């Protein structure tokens, strides 16, 4: 996975004002990423009047069949760009590296005309014998293009551009300036319940959108949920947006390298992270939309307590975690849960049900009482203060 560093959380206005100055001080010029506009018309996918469901079926078929591996990485990358919606090609200036991963780096990019700042993942395609990155790269491009063809979702990272230049592939997505949800939890601790609910609602909405169109993320975890805005005061739940390019959403689901249709006999190397896999995947390789809901239950547990539901101290061996996932119920019997509402615990319990057929779907999660309390009721009821602190009389039973 490509992890964005904390520098990505800088306000875009500061980035824009300082980038050219930094480069001039270094005596460097920004790299020009010119990509000549080409016609990649797909009459079946781009035809006017194509229904979202037709696009979904087409996209799911492309994902399930997969794109043929070529001995030349360039040819393979070009093939990966063919399915899906037509994207407008632009020139991007590349600046400082803001992240790195197993298969490439992420650099800050700026659109030459609009000034939009984006995250540019750069994947070298120089070694045709190293095929490890290609399937994940193909899945990510196909999934992001399918989401875009379906109209996109405010809580799913948006694909801005994808092109090949030289022997490198450039994948341009919107920049989530607040960094990873994981980093926020590490830096600031567990979330206030109301803010955790906001994140959970957006993620459930994003997954509902994907699942309706036959797409399963297969790697939902705090590292793959990006914050749209910089944290100002985590304890009070205050976030700052600094620019007109800021998204109206709080979070963005990212990293679609494992995404695809539901699958059976799934190769565990092609999906998710072991700590977030549900029992049915570990037992039989069955990976459906229910897998995403299990993982989201783990994420919500972590947001509210700061601990993983099956690895409370973060020190357990994978085999121990796997045993607990398969056989032990989720528990809330430590102090971090003392002030968390019963509704929140009930929702998590229904997401971490062992039987995938009984697990809440994304739509059912959105209808859960914890998700639908009004702001006033939630503020009064999700964390119940002592009657004395609330200035309320305490009834005293006669002796």
Swiss-Prot record:
Keywords: ATP-binding, Kinase, Nucleotide-binding, Serine/threonine-protein kinase, Transferase. GO terms for molecular function: ATP binding; protein serine kinase activity; protein serine/threonine kinase activity. It is an enzyme of class 2 (transferase). ATP binds at residues 98-106, 121. It catalyses: L-seryl-[protein] + ATP = O-phospho-L-seryl-[protein] + ADP + H(+); L-threonyl-[protein] + ATP = O-phospho-L-threonyl-[protein] + ADP + H(+). The active site is at residue 219. Residues 92-371 form the Protein kinase domain. The keyword NAD does not apply. Signal peptide: none annotated. It comes from the Eukaryota. Its EC number is 2.7.11.1. May regulate an early stage of the zoospore pathway. Belongs to the protein kinase superfamily. CAMK Ser/Thr protein kinase family. This is Serine/threonine-protein kinase PKZ1. It comes from Phytophthora infestans (strain T30-4) (Potato late blight agent). The lineage of its organism: Eukaryota, Sar, Stramenopiles, Oomycota, Peronosporales.
């Amino acid at each position: 996975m490509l992890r964005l560093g904390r520098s990505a959380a800088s306000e875009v206005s500061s980035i824009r004002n300082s980038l050219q100055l930094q480069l001039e001080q270094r005596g460097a010029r920004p790299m020009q990423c010119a990509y000549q506009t080409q016609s990649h018309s797909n009459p079946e996918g781009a035809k006017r009047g194509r229904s979202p469901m037709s696009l979904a079926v087409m996209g799911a078929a492309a994902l399930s069949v997969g794109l043929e591996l070529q001995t030349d990485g360039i040819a393979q990358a070009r093939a990966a760009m063919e399915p899906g919606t037509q994207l407008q090609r632009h020139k991007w200036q590349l600046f400082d590296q803001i992240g790195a991963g197993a298969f490439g780096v992420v650099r800050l990019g700026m659109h030459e005309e609009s000034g939009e700042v984006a995250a540019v993942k750069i994947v070298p395609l120089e070694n045709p014998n190293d095929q490890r990155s290609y399937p994940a790269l193909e899945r990510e491009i196909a999934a992001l293009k399918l989401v875009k063809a379906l109209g996109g979702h405010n809580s799913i990272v948006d694909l801005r551009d994808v092109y090949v230049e030289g022997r490198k592939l450039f994948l341009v997505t919107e920049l989530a300036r607040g960094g990873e949800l994981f980093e926020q939890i590490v830096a600031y601790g567990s979330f206030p319940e109301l803010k955790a609910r906001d994140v959970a609602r957006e993620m459930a909405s994003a997954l509902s959108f994907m699942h309706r169109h036959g797409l399963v993320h297969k790697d939902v975890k705090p590292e793959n949920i990006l914050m749209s805005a910089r944290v100002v005061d985590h304890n009070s739940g205050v976030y700052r947006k600094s620019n007109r390019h800021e998204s109206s959403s709080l979070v963005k689901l990212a990293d679609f390298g494992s995404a695809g249709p539901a699958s059976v006999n799934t190769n565990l190397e092609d999906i998710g992270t072991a700590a977030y896999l549900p029992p049915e995947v570990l037992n039989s390789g069955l990976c459906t939309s229910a897998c995403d809901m299990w993982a989201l239950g783990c994420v919500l547990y972590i947001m509210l307590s700061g601990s993983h539901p099956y690895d409370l101290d973060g020190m357990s061996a994978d085999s121990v975690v796997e045993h607990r996932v398969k056989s032990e119920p989720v528990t809330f019997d430590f102090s971090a849960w003392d002030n968390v509402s019963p509704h929140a615990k009930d929702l998590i319990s229904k997401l971490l049900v062992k039987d995938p057929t009984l697990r809440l779907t994304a739509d059912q999660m959105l209808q859960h009482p914890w998700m639908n309390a009004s702001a006033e009721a939630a503020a009064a009821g999700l964390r119940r203060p002592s009657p004395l602190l609330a200035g309320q009389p305490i009834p005293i039973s006669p002796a």
